A protein has these predicted regions:
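Noncatalytic, beta-rich nucleic-acid-contacting surfaces in large DNA/RNA-processing enzymes
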Residues: 1-265
């Protein structure tokens, strides 16, 4: 997905983040742009997505987090899904402050669940059956909380989507990285795929040419096994272990603007 998003950028096609008011289940076209689908958000199942789309189609596009949760069939969506949508930025159309949204969503979901349990017939709204207490809860204002920093917000986006959409934490360092790096993660990964493909082809008695795209072929011709290379990026994850010889070893996910490569140290 990161490669496709970058390719869209090179073709001046903007990829929009997921949005509870506009996204469909899968990727969709919106005014010549591509909108990220809700199925791409971690912890959000198909039933929850159906409930979100049905609510906005039948009851109108919600104006805030209070209306959003009030309109939902709360039996089809849980707290984890709402939390993931907020972290992914899919609720930014309701309020831009993720910290404030995360502060109130649990209480709103619990109120909606309590109201739903009281509503045995399943016909009345939360306002109808919850009285003044529910009405006050859903008409309240978001608390004044300091917004998350850009890096924290982007980290949440990456965690929930598996990719950066709105920005990239390394974007400001792109020029410096180009000056010191001799290889990108995309080139390195292509070279590895090409080597594995060649080995499989030789074992099967064929070369298997033409199966890689041009960028992969170019990378394979430039990168050779055993050569030294410099890759610039940030450590997105790390896993350490002790070898049989009692030495420390680590597997590091090194991420740049083009993807992720595993590094062993």
């Amino acid at each position: 997905i990161p490669k496709y998003i970058r390719n869209c950028g090179e073709m001046n096609i903007e990829v929009l983040p997921p949005c509870v008011n506009k996204s469909m289940k899968k990727f969709s076209v919106e005014d010549g742009k591509i909108r990220f689908g809700l199925m791409g958000v971690k912890n959000v199942g198909e039933n929850a997505i159906d409930a979100i789309i049905k609510a906005r189609e039948e009851k109108g596009v919600p104006r805030d987090i209070f209306t959003f949760i009030e309109q939902l069939d709360i039996s089809q969506i849980n707290k984890k899904a709402i939390e993931s949508l907020i972290k992914a930025g899919a609720c930014s159309c309701l309020a831009e402050n993720k910290a404030a949204l995360l502060d109130v969503y649990e209480g709103l979901v619990e109120s909606a669940q309590n109201a739903s349990r009281k509503n045995l017939a399943g016909q009345m709204s939360l306002f109808d059956i919850g009285g003044e207490e529910a009405a006050e809860s859903l008409s309240a204002k978001l608390p004044e909380i300091t917004p998350f920093s850009k890096d924290v917000s982007l980290a949440m986006e990456k965690e929930m989507l598996g990719v950066y959409i709105t920005d990239h934490p390394l974007k400001d360092y792109a020029e410096k990285m180009r000056k010191v790096a001799s290889i990108t993660s995309e080139e390195l990964n292509h070279a590895g795929e090409n080597q594995e493909m060649d080995e499989n082809s030789l074992a099967q008695g064929s070369l298997g040419q033409g199966s890689l795209d041009q960028s992969g072929a170019d990378s394979a011709s430039r990168i050779k096994d055993g050569m030294k290379a410099v890759m610039a990026g940030m450590v997105s994850s790390k896993r350490t272990l002790i070898t049989k010889s009692n030495k420390m070893m680590a597997f590091i996910a090194l991420e740049d603007l083009y993807g992720v490569s595993e590094v062993v140290v």
